[in-house]
A protein has these predicted regions:
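Transmembrane-helix motifs of polytopic, lipid-linked glycan transferases
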Residues: 40, 112, 116-136, 174, ...
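Aromatic/acidic, Gly/Pro-rich catalytic loop(s) in extracytoplasmic/lumenal soluble domains
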Residues: 488-557
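Transmembrane-lumen/periplasm boundary regions of multi-pass, lipid-linked membrane glycan transferases
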Residues: 67, 81, 87, 219-337, ...
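Short helix- or helix-capping micro-motifs
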Residues: 39-42, 145-150, 157, 177, ...
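Hydrophobic/aromatic-rich transmembrane helices and adjacent perimembrane loops
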Residues: 158-159, 165-168, 207, 216, ...
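Membrane-interface transmembrane helices that cradle and orient dolichyl/undecaprenyl
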Residues: 134-136, 140, 175-197, 207, ...
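Transmembrane-helix signature of polytopic, membrane-embedded enzymes
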Residues: 101-105, 129-151, 170, 188-191, ...
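Short acidic/glycine- and proline-prone juxtamembrane loop motifs at membrane-interface regions
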Residues: 56-57, 81, 154, 160-167
Length: 557
């Protein structure tokens, strides 16, 4: 007697766990309208008050690179990162300048212009999350996942900084939209799937032109590999198509990031790879200092760093949905799309959790997978509740929808309350607002108060006063904007520069900028000096400004 086994064909098959039609599945118009609402509302959260916080030191590097491009053409400025995002930022800044020259009464701040491209691609990512999730798990789960992304305070906060991670995740998602469509075309139609393969390759080229993290491509390859041992599968690229694939990927990368051909770019990448571009010797995590070198591996920032982020930085109901679904990822009834999510988690953990250097912005590339998993958990919980509270078939369709609306509404409320300082959001597990800035102060504050600190000092300081901080280049930039180019901005971690401080000079102690190199000095100021100003982001203390008198100076020296 032979045992019959159903062939694994494509993840696009609806998983048995969610069999049946939901409230929106029968109406393409409603689905389209819902997506438009999610993108527009998500964009609103991401662009409103985009200049409410000052630039970070990292963002200033992007602004300077754009200025260098405009002054000298393509250069190796900020060459450790690819060019695509900076090109978009250059366009945004040029358009903002034209706007400001035309509409003098409503100028666009440099902070807004620089951050706008990442905010836009962040909002558009909701569509890509929907398309991937609908291919894997169905329309209802896809809408929940897209809504969770659109309104998640951490996703919004990460999309509101001018860093490459938002572009990286956008093109990674776009590549896998085409990858999964290619799988469906190969398995279920007689038409050629080649166009989807080439679009996938182009998207991956754009991804690498956004940030040098090519190993994310391994997620798609591992998922593809899962099906290659099955005689029934028609989803096979072959050597020739793979060669064309990588050729397209490489050409698109070169077109979108031609600065990679410059010798200076390779010099900058070499310095970055050797850890010589890391300007500080530590990272504060949960009130403890850790080394921040990638090569420290398990001796650096703890492995559980991103687990803590997941527990405290996502809306509570989204966390519960994620935890509820984790066991489901190992159930066959969830469908073969679960393998894509499992590979996503596995390869991301290997790449990001075991290195010694970590930043919360790296979480951007796994957050869609977390929210998709959460959406699965919410849908499962809704179906489970429906089966227990009603025998009515029609009513059973509405219970999961109502639960999803409750969860999404919770995310909306959290984001409304967190605005415009979304990175400071903590759920009740993390202690809420009272504990904001405790877990990841470097990434939560991200130099946001430096602009206000320099503005305060500019009104007080004598000519030629020194200003010590851990972001001297950023301080100098804002001093120039405040028309105080006479101020001498120095590093708090430079012992020789600190020795030159005199009575009437200033020290800025920003939360998140505590390192091994300045810990003793900051403790001395805290114990023996009184700040002349204390700045806040919303209600959360973010920085202190000290004007040195003879007593404070003697304690420092």
């Amino acid at each position: 007697m032979s045992v019959h086994a159903d062939a694994i064909i494509t993840a696009g098959l609806r998983p048995d766990l969610f069999a049946g039609r939901g409230v929106l599945a029968n109406s393409k118009a409603l689905v389209f309208a819902a997506l438009i609402v999610l993108v527009v509302a998500g964009l609103g959260f991401r662009v409103t008050g985009l200049s409410a916080e000052g630039l970070s030191e990292d963002e200033l590097n992007k602004l300077n690179a754009v200025a260098d491009y405009r002054a000298h053409g393509l250069t190796g400025a900020n060459g450790e990162h690819p060019m695509l995002m900076k090109a978009c930022q250059a366009v945004s800044i040029i358009l903002a300048e034209k706007w400001n020259n035309t509409f003098l009464s409503n100028p666009i701040a440099p902070e807004t212009a620089l951050r706008l491209p990442t905010a836009v691609v962040g909002a558009l990512s909701a569509i890509l999350i929907f398309l991937i999730t609908s291919e894997l798990f169905g329309v209802e789960v896809a809408l929940i996942a897209a809504a969770l992304w659109a309104f998640d305070p951490s996703a919004i906060g990460l999309n509101r900084i001018a860093k490459e991670d938002s572009f990286l995740v956008f093109f990674f998602l776009l590549a896998n939209v085409f990858w999964l469509r290619g799988q469906r075309a190969a398995e279920s139609t007689d038409s050629s799937p080649n166009k989807y393969y080439w679009l996938t390759a182009a998207s991956y080229g754009a991804m690498v032109a956004s940030k040098y993290v090519p190993h994310l491509f391994a997620i798609s390859i591992c998922y593809y590999w899962m099906f290659q041992g099955l005689p029934e599968t028609r989803w096979r690229l072959g050597k020739k198509r793979l060669l064309i694939f990588f050729t397209i990927m490489g050409l698109v990368f070169l077109v979108l990031s031609p600065t990679v051909l410059l010798p200076e770019t390779w010099r900058q990448m070499g310095l970055f790879a050797g850890g010589k571009r890391i300007s500080h010797d530590g990272y504060e995590f949960m009130n403890h200092l850790y080394t921040q070198r990638f090569s420290d591996w398990l001796n650096g920032i703890p492995v559980y760093f991103y687990l803590v982020f997941t527990a405290v930085k996502l809306p509570l109901l989204a966390v519960l949905g994620f935890v509820a679904c984790l066991p489901l990822l190992f159930r066959r009834k969830l469908g073969d799309g679960r393998y894509f999510i499992l590979f996503w988690f596995l390869l991301w953990v290997v790449a990001f959790c075991f290195s010694g250097g970590k930043f919360t912005r790296y979480y951007t590339t796994i957050l869609p997978a977390v929210l998709i998993t959460s959406a699965l958990g919410i849908q499962f919980a809704g179906r489970w509740l429906a089966n227990r509270i009603s025998d009515s078939v029609s009513l059973k369709h509405y219970v999961p929808a109502i639960l999803a609306v409750i969860v999404i509404a919770g995310s909306v409320i959290d984001s409304v309350n967190a605005a415009p300082h979304f990175r400071l959001f903590l759920n009740s597990i993390g202690g809420g607002t009272n504990w904001a800035g405790y877990y990841f102060p470097h990434d939560e504050f991200y130099d946001a108060s430096m602009r206000d600190a320099i503005a305060e000092i500019a009104t007080r300081a004598r000519t030629g006063a020194r200003v010590a901080s851990e972001s001297p280049s950023l301080a100098a930039y804002y001093a120039e904007r405040a028309k105080r180019t006479d101020l001498v901005c120095i590093s708090l971690s430079d012992p020789d520069a600190v020795k030159q401080l005199a009575v009437g000079d200033y020290v800025i102690v920003a939360r998140g900028r505590r390192y091994f190199s300045n810990d003793a000095l900051i403790s001395t100021l805290r114990d023996h000096a009184t700040p002349i100003a204390e700045l806040k982001l919303g209600v959360v203390p973010s920085a202190k400004i000290y004007e040195l008198d003879q007593s404070a100076l003697s304690n420092l020296h």
